[in-house]
Amino acid sequence: MIFERRNPVASANSTVDLRGSGHSLINLSASSGSNHLIRFSLADGTLITGDFSIHFQSLSADFIIDLSSAKCLAFVAIETSFA
């Protein structure tokens, strides 16, 4: 897997956990009040995107994707704005 972070907030911490079941758990922790775009690029050319906001009450978010039928080529977390 290729893991990529573009323009993350200074305190961002991202981990990728590939599970034997074919699921990948993506965890990204960053400064509160920031918004992020998550993008997965799969081997078959499919792009999957998801947005989440990190609030003061919750400083991390998990994003789970089923990779049983496609290999994830890239994971990108992009800072989009500040709340």
Curated annotation (Swiss-Prot):
Domain of life the protein comes from: Viruses
Name of the protein in its database record: Putative protein p39
Lineage of source species: Viruses, Duplodnaviria, Heunggongvirae, Uroviricota, Caudoviricetes
GN (gene name): 39
